[in-house]
Amino acid sequence: MLPHGLIVSCQALPDEPLHSSFIMSKMALAAYEGGAVGIRANTKEDILAIKETVDLPVIGIVKRDYNHSDVFITATSKEVDELIESQCEVIALDATLQQRPKETLDELVSYIRTHAPNVEIMADIATVEEAKNAARLGFDYIGTTLHGYTSYTQGQLLYQNDFQFLKDVLQSVDAKVIAEGNVITPDMYKRVMDLGVHCSVVGGAITRPKEITKRFVQVMED
């Protein structure tokens, strides 16, 4: 089980300056030394490098685009197999109701339970309906990861109206809820923890210096 506390997302996509399994392992080490209780990471290679560097539970994902589907976070059993090989403690997957490129969501859950019974599963959702569906399918954790990042929630921010969407999710499911997506300040992190989430994932505000720099520059340009 993931501990209560701060999970730091250590990811860099191929077009980003820090794209490197070695660099992500050092980012994870910095997060560990700062007090993080877990890491969220993308790709088998990054996860293996991170697990060689820090003794923290890892939420693993594989981001991969597929034609004719907007689902790109651990979309099929191919990505699941890669994550099982990485020996991450938690596999996270897109649990939205969008059209999937291959297996259905419940088929993927069954696949993980069969092939990796000791691995927990996290649902990345965008709506309360999707949270309820994930709870019905037996996900161990439900994360607000994709709220604001789907075509039908675009422009919505997790912290709007004092985290009302997060409150709605917490009231709608019994599963452990993870706050993720636009938790961008220590005060926001404290607020979501006070609301009763099991843990919170913070990424860009900690591990994406290019984006952090752009925010500083932007305030003067605006």
Swiss-Prot record:
It is an enzyme of class 5 (isomerase). It comes from the Bacteria. Pathway: Amino-sugar metabolism; N-acetylneuraminate degradation; D-fructose 6-phosphate from N-acetylneuraminate: step 3/5. The keyword Isomerase applies. Keywords: Carbohydrate metabolism, Isomerase. Transmembrane segments: none annotated. It holds the Pfam family NanE. One of its GO terms (cellular component) is cytosol. The keyword Isomerase applies. Belongs to the NanE family. NCBIfam families: PRK01130.1. PANTHER family: N-ACETYLMANNOSAMINE-6-PHOSPHATE 2-EPIMERASE-RELATED (PTHR36204:SF1). HAMAP family: ManNAc6P_epimer (MF_01235). This is Putative N-acetylmannosamine-6-phosphate 2-epimerase. It comes from Staphylococcus aureus (strain MSSA476).
